Amino acid sequence: MELTRVILHPYTTEKTYSIRNKSEHETLTFIVDKNANKYQIREAFIAIFGLKPLKIRTTNRGPAKIRTSTARPGYTKAKKIAYIVMPIGVKVAVSKEEVEAANAK
């Protein structure tokens, strides 16, 4: 699997924002390829950001039922989420606003 296709995009929700700012370790969350393992995620993160993560945790989210106007329920897509923990003091700019703020300094 190509390293550029392992990490798909950042995953930003209220929960991930609170996890990121909760402890002294910065925790980043990404949607990753369903077939990627932790070693491939680590190598892709190092290739993209140039930083070595402290720990990586993954979880698989299955499709969830959603309401539709028909009698049959709809489903969301299944996804794999990677929680990447960085060492103390290491900050990574993931969102567009963070990159612009870092460049302005």
From Swiss-Prot:
InterPro entries: Nucleotide-bd_a/b_plait_sf (IPR012677), Ribosomal_uL23-like (IPR013025), Ribosomal_uL23/eL15/eS24_sf (IPR012678). It holds the Pfam family Ribosomal_L23. It comes from the Bacteria. GO terms for cellular component: ribonucleoprotein complex; ribosome. GO terms for biological process: translation. One of its GO terms (molecular function) is structural constituent of ribosome. The keyword Transmembrane does not apply. Keywords: Ribonucleoprotein, Ribosomal protein, RNA-binding, rRNA-binding. Belongs to the universal ribosomal protein uL23 family. Part of the 50S ribosomal subunit. Contacts protein L29, and trigger factor when it is bound to the ribosome. One of the early assembly proteins it binds 23S rRNA. One of the proteins that surrounds the polypeptide exit tunnel on the outside of the ribosome. Forms the main docking site for trigger factor binding to the ribosome. This is Large ribosomal subunit protein uL23. It comes from Ureaplasma urealyticum serovar 10 (strain ATCC 33699 / Western). The lineage of its organism: Bacteria, Bacillati, Mycoplasmatota, Mycoplasmoidales, Mycoplasmoidaceae. The gene is rplW.
